[in-house]
Amino acid sequence: MLKNSFFSIILKEQEENKENRGSVEFQVVSFTNKIRKLTSHLELHKKDYLSQRGLRKILGKRQRLLAYLSKKNRARYKELIGQLDIRERKTR
């Protein structure tokens, strides 16, 4: 639960900047929170296939946003990945 409280703190920091809600970082943080909640839900309900599909869709959206951010600003990408404690995307 320590991770969840950490992410809510990051989310509150970014919510204070009302004009920043459309930023890539804010969207990635909110998608990460949704992913964590869905993952914990799916640990209890293994056969909830609709939630599995929703999780895959959110993962794809976050992956596309992170790819965009890594192309546009590599430093912000590295900082965000470090804050959220997620793996760097694979490159081909």
From Swiss-Prot:
One of its GO terms (biological process) is translation. Disulfide bonds: none annotated. One of its GO terms (molecular function) is structural constituent of ribosome. It is found in: Plastid, Chloroplast. The keyword Ribosomal protein applies. InterPro entries: Ribosomal_uS15, Ribosomal_uS15_bac-type, uS15_NS1_RNA-bd_sf. Pfam families: Ribosomal_S15. This is Small ribosomal subunit protein uS15c.
